[in-house]
From Swiss-Prot:
Proton-coupled transporter that transports a wide spectrum of oxo derivatives of heterocyclic nitrogen compounds, including allantoin, uric acid and xanthine, but not adenine. Mediates high affinity transport of uracil and 5-fluorouracil (a toxic uracil analog). Mediates transport of free pyrimidines and may function during early seedling development in salvage pathways, by the utilization of pyrimidines from seed storage tissue. Residues 32-44, 103-104, 161-229, 294-315, 363-371 are cytoplasmic. This is Ureide permease 2. One of its GO terms (molecular function) is ATP binding. The chain crosses the membrane at residues 11-31, 45-65, 82-102, 105-125, 140-160, 230-250, 273-293, 316-336, 342-362, 372-392. Residues 1-10, 66-81, 126-139, 251-272, 337-341, 393-398 are extracellular. Signal peptide: none annotated. Belongs to the plant ureide permease (TC 2.A.7.19) family. The keyword Ubl conjugation does not apply.
Length: 398
């Protein structure tokens, strides 16, 4: 079994996890904006997310010889370690609930702000719990100022969402006024939205304009016009609460701080715990998304399992997202085993990556107000500061 034994190796795992975990949300957002039902996408994503855990378990988990206190993956499957297994599976359940929630929050709140708020809540609650579970191996005088920065980022993220929503309402209102002045009687938003008002020639709308927002609304799967701002924020905060619990649960699974294992039974190695973690994550995702096929939420159209099986539009992108998330989580846990899970939560800086994709790929916050830009800058500044502080707090597990 391969173990990360150095602080440098742990930080390398965190950085690779950061890149992976910051990219897969952008892939799912792209599919939703192209009109693919989120239920279909999440089912595909869940398959490769589980497959990534299996690959990690049978490679890194089987490298080297078995030791009494660090058995290989297959050896540990037959051991009486169910108390730790249940903690790992509980972590997988809350992670799956969080990921499923964010898929809807990305549409309602935006990729950048959703990731900022959920990641900040994860650090504020999760890193605090991990600090005590890890016997305080992280430096408190460094860790908790970083946690405070993340807490401020939560407030700033909520303010960014409200300000940007107000900007979009103003754009749509001005666009409707311009249409009335140019063509007389009002027409329903969305009709001929991609045509120039003067020349009536079809043009591609510029990112951030009212026409861009209208065209996006017409093509995307989750409709956002008319939805209350509080709905998206409520889903986002629920997801953040779920995310804040999965890392402490995994910590308990691998380190048995509450002494639930029988005398002589070795603790779960990170690869075995990650396997059980991913199995429960897959099961809950499968159950909920099959239910959502027939009983959709947020006004989505009904589907069926047969329709899902026949929907190959964007399936390979969803598979890619699952691999990115699976390997990202695996790397996070490998790093956390060495440097402490409170420091490994620094991968919750993934909004820095997601914001890059949100701005570059999706044109988020284009042509927004100065107030929105100022709030966005302050939010990201707090994130950069908090991540640096959180990584500096990392200790080394004895």
């Amino acid at each position: 079994m391969y173990l990360v034994e150095s602080k440098g190796g742990a930080i390398a795992c965190m950085l690779l996890a950061l890149l992976s975990l910051g990219t897969w949300p952008a892939v799912l957002t792209l599919l939703e904006r192209r009109g693919r039902l989120p239920q279909h996408t999440y089912l595909d994503y869940s398959i490769t997310n589980l497959l990534a855990a299996i690959i990690i378990a049978f490679t890194f988990g089987q490298i080297g010889s078995t030791k009494p206190d660090s058995p290989n993956f297959i050896t540990q499957l037959a051991q009486d370690n169910w108390p730790s297994v249940m903690f790992a599976m509980a972590g997988g359940i809350v992670l799956s609930l969080g990921n499923l929630s964010t898929q809807y929050a990305w549409a309602l709140v935006g990729l950048s702000v959703t990731e900022v708020i959920t990641s900040s809540i994860t650090v504020v609650i999760g890193s605090t719990l991990n600090y005590f579970l890890d016997d305080k191996i992280n430096k408190a005088e460094i860790l908790f100022p970083g946690v405070a920065c993340f807490l401020i980022a939560v407030c700033l993220g909520s303010a960014v969402h409200r300000s940007n929503a107000d900007d979009n309402k103003a754009k749509l209102r001005d666009f409707e006024t311009a249409k009335q002045e140019a063509s007389g009687p009002s027409t329903e938003i969305g009709t001929n939205s991609s045509k120039d008002l003067e020349t009536n020639v079809t043009t591609k709308p510029k990112e951030g304009t009212a026409r861009f927002l209208i065209e996006l609304e017409n093509t995307r799967a989750i409709k956002v016009f008319g939805k209350r701002k509080i709905i998206g924020l409520a889903i986002t905060f629920f997801a953040g609460l779920c995310f804040s619990l999965f890392s402490p649960a995994f910590n308990l699974a691998t380190n048995d701080q509450w002494n639930r294992l029988k005398q002589g039974v070795p603790k779960l190695v990170v690869y075995t715990a990650f396997f059980y973690f991913s199995v429960s994550c897959f099961i809950i995702a499968l159950i909920l998304n099959v239910v959502f096929l027939y009983y959709p939420v947020l006004g989505l159209p009904k589907s069926s399992f047969k329709a899902y099986l026949n929907d190959w539009n964007g399936r390979y992108w969803a598979f890619l997202a699952g691999f990115l998330c699976g390997f990202g989580n695996g790397l996070q846990f490998m790093g956390g085993q060495a440097a402490g899970y409170a420091a490994a939560d620094s991968v919750q800086a993934l909004p820095l990556v997601s914001t890059f994709w949100g701005v570059v790929l999706f044109g988020e916050y284009r042509r927004s107000s100065r107030k929105t830009y100022l709030l966005l800058f302050c939010m990201l500044f707090m994130f950069i500061s908090a991540v640096a502080v959180l990584m500096a707090s990392s200790g080394h597990r004895k």
